[in-house]
């Protein structure tokens, strides 16, 4: 972990700036989302979308994907070098939905990437505005986290599917930078490292030569990012051991899986940010609001206020429940896929139900789905209260790391205790002697055994009325502790497959 002096709030990572004070951070984050909004408005003009079509979340996602694809240098280079992929390396596009005679029709559009880049830069004062691109990536990642389960990916890397609460950001692209690294869960980092080690085991040249040197640097950097997410000395010491290994192999994989399991109780620091679809920023910019002047924060009241005042729509399939579709998008907007459902329900003011009980599939409509039967509905994205987003993992002050329910990685900084089945978690540690037994392992297991489920996390932290923008009067909710609060609990969500 870098020394305290170089730690920046994660909103700064988002804007790529040097150290800034709170006002400067608010201004640069405001500049970033304002740029996204201006770009979106311009794209709606280019595509001749009317007001209703511009507020359709599916159109927003297509436009977001186009700009991300236009700036994806590595993929663009790959497409140019492999012309037989059947894709035009210079073009990008996707489905745009329009309303004609009361029916929704799908139109596939194609644009020059160069043209999209020009529009994006023009909306961002001539700059590349990579922070804005990363912001869109995180919104897509949060949407995937709320929509899909990663059971298959977990099993493939030898991890337990019950560790899904550690998988935030698992679909973020490699190029998502510091802001992307901040929101990745422990399991996501572990999975990336395991994939890398497995390649090294199967491919003798992976760590060798000039390329191998770069690979090694990437490996150590990822180890350091993961180490920085752990909050106990023993977990960090184990990460040093994994990083310094001369020839990473099965022992390291076992150590990493052990660490991932330990994170179910001794939770890591994972940042949460409310990243909204581009159309929301577009609407607010169009209404004359000046984001840069007013300032903006991804972790405060601002995103809640935006959602209170924006009406956006979604296409809906015949047997889907509009309220459930709204819940899915609400969770994605607040990065709350791994939050305790009781906390989310309290903040939202409507019951938030587990994924398995939702009658809704993903937001995007596949190209082979029949548009005849597809309708549209308003998404209900408003909330009753707001709360500060956390990056701490909710560990109590008494011990550096506290009890964590299997399947919760808190999003909101709100007082609660985190019930968990210690037996379930500890059972995962038996009969695994492949990794090194060490003082660190013993110490980690001891800390886990001593963790008390009734310890209160985020002491005194509460939710706030939407009118309480300065967060002066915290309302500390009391929760019914008998109910299990995890979203993917007993689940049948679709798998995410790239």
UniProtKB/Swiss-Prot annotation:
It is found in: Virion; Host nucleus. Belongs to the influenza viruses nucleoprotein family. The keyword Ligase does not apply. HAMAP family: INFV_NCAP (MF_04070). Residues 1-22 are annotated as: Disordered. One of its GO terms (cellular component) is viral nucleocapsid. One of its GO terms (biological process) is symbiont entry into host cell. A motif (Unconventional nuclear localization signal) lies at residues 1-18. GO terms for molecular function: RNA binding; structural molecule activity. Keywords: Capsid protein, Helical capsid protein, Host nucleus, Host-virus interaction, Ribonucleoprotein, RNA-binding, Viral nucleoprotein, Viral penetration into host nucleus, Virion, Virus entry into host cell. Homomultimerizes to form the nucleocapsid. May bind host exportin-1/XPO1. Binds to viral genomic RNA. Protein-RNA contacts are mediated by a combination of electrostatic interactions between positively charged residues and the phosphate backbone and planar interactions between aromatic side chains and bases. A motif (Bipartite nuclear localization signal) lies at residues 198-216. This is Nucleoprotein. Late in virus-infected cells, may be cleaved from a 56-kDa protein to a 53-kDa protein by a cellular caspase. This cleavage might be a marker for the onset of apoptosis in infected cells or have a specific function in virus host interaction. It comes from the Viruses. Pfam families: Flu_NP.
């Amino acid at each position: 972990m870098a020394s305290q002096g170089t730690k920046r709030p994660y909103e700064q990572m988002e804007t790529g700036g040097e150290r800034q004070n709170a006002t400067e951070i608010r201004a640069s984050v405001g500049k970033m989302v304002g740029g996204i909004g201006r770009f979106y408005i311009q794209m709606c003009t280019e595509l001749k979308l009317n007001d209703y079509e511009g507020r359709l979340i599916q159109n927003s996602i297509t436009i977001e994907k186009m700009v991300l694809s236009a700036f994806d240098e590595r993929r663009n280079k790959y497409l140019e070098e492999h012309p037989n992929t059947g894709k035009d390396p210079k073009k990008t596009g996707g489905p745009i939905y329009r309303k004609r005679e009361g029916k929704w029709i799908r139109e596939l559009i194609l644009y020059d990437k160069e043209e999209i880049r020009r529009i994006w830069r023009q909306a961002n004062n001539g700059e590349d505005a990579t922070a804005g691109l990363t912001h869109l990536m995180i919104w897509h990642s949060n949407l995937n986290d709320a929509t899909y389960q990663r059971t298959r990916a977990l099993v493939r890397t030898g991890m337990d599917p019950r560790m899904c609460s550690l998988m935030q950001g698992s679909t973020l692209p490699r190029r998502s930078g510091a802001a992307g690294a901040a929101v990745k869960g422990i399991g996501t980092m572990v999975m990336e490292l395991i994939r890398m080690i497995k390649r090294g085991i199967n491919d003798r040249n992976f760590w060798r030569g000039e390329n191998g040197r770069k690979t090694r640097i990437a490996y150590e950097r990822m180890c350091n990012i993961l180490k920085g997410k752990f909050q106990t000395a023993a977990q960090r010491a184990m990460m040093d051991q994994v990083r310094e290994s001369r020839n990473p192999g099965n022992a390291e994989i076992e150590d990493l899986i052990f660490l991932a399991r330990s994170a179910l109780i001794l939770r890591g620091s994972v940042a949460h940010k409310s990243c909204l679809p581009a159309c929301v920023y577009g609407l607010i910019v169009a209404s004359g609001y000046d984001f840069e002047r007013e300032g903006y924060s991804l972790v405060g009241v601002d995103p809640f206020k935006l959602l209170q005042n924006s009406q956006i729509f979604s296409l809906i399939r015949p047997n889907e429940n509009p309220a459930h579709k709204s819940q899915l998008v609400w969770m994605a907007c607040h990065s709350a896929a791994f939050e305790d459902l009781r906390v989310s329900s309290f903040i939202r003011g409507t019951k938030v139900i587990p994924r398995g009980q939702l009658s809704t599939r993903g937001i995007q409509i596949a190209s082979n789905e029949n548009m005849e039967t597809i309708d549209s509905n308003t998404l209900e994205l408003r909330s009753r209260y707001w709360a500060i987003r956390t990056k701490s993992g909710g560990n109590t002050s008494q011990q550096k790391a506290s009890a964590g329910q299997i399947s919760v990685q808190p999003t909101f900084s709100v007082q609660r205790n985190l019930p968990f089945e210690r037996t379930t978690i500890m059972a995962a540690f038996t009969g695994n002697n492949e990794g090194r037994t060490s003082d660190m392992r013993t110490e980690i297991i001891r800390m886990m055994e001593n963790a008390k489920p009734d310890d209160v996390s985020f002491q005194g932290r509460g939710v706030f009325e939407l009118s309480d923008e300065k967060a002066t009067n915290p309302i500390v909710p009391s929760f019914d502790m008998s109910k299990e609060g995890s979203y993917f609990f007993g689940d049948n969500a679709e798998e995410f497959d790239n």
